[in-house]
């Protein structure tokens, strides 16, 4: 800064290389940082208020949040855990993405290639190759290849493979069968059967035990409980 109040960047010799001699430290009340040159590698020690700074560990895990990924060890690799206790139980699972408060917190221990994004998404679930998006989506879903998108979608589906629940409370009441596709708000909310295809808001709402059904449209077979 010169006397006239102007600011300049650089040195009196613009071709001078960046060296330790012309770096500096800025004190700024909330922290102390190196000036950033080049790729910013000198910007260090920025805390995130959690168990880790924003650096991957030796196994390639990237973790941020109090208690997130707290049980990971030498065979827990290439995971991304962000949020309070996200992925807290994982001790051997790989290539998972858990984002949000308590996302996949309790029982995901060894599953691989899962995605849980949202408050308590997949909190008590397990398995591999599953996708949970939304608050409490797939809350207790276990198995493989499941998809739950929407608040409480597939919330209590405790097992079964290749289930798809899309919509607020879609297929939320549970069951253990697989190969069911439910799309629509409250569609199949109480459905516990297997190999069903339910499309439309409230379609198959009370289909508690029926299998091999196809219901299409708003309120389709809403009162049906056990037909197959």
Q: Model regions: which residues?
A:
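A signal for long, low-complexity, Ser/Thr/Asn-enriched, surface-exposed stalk/shaft
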Residues: 2-7, 20-50
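Glycine- and small/polar-enriched repetitive beta-structure motifs of secreted/surface proteins
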Residues: 4-6, 10, 46-228
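Short, surface-exposed charged micro-motifs
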Residues: 17
């Amino acid at each position: 800064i010169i006397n006239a109040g102007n600011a300049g960047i650089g040195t009196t010799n613009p071709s001078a290389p960046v060296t330790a001699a012309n770096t500096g430290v800025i004190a700024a009340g909330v922290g102390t940082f190196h000036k950033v040159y080049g790729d910013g590698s000198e910007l260090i020690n920025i805390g995130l208020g959690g168990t880790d700074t924003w650096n991957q560990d030796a196994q390639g895990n990237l973790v941020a949040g109090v208690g997130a990924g707290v049980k990971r060890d030498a065979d827990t690799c290439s995971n991304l855990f962000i949020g309070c206790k996200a992925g807290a139980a994982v001790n051997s699972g790989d290539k998972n993405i858990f984002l949000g408060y308590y996302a996949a917190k309790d029982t995901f221990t060894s599953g691989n290639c899962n995605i849980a994004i949202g408050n308590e998404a997949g909190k008590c679930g397990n398995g591999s190759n599953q996708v949970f998006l939304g608050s409490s989506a797939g809350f207790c879903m276990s198995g493989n290849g499941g998809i739950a998108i929407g608040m409480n979608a597939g919330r209590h589906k405790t097992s079964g493979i290749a289930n798809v629940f899309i919509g607020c409370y879609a297929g939320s009441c549970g069951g253990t069968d697989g190969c069911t596709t439910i799309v629509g708000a409250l569609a199949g909310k109480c459905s516990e059967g297997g190999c069903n295809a339910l499309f439309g808001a409230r379609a198959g709402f009370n289909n508690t035990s029926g299998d091999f059904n196809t219901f299409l449209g708003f309120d389709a077979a809403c009162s049906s409980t056990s037909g197959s």
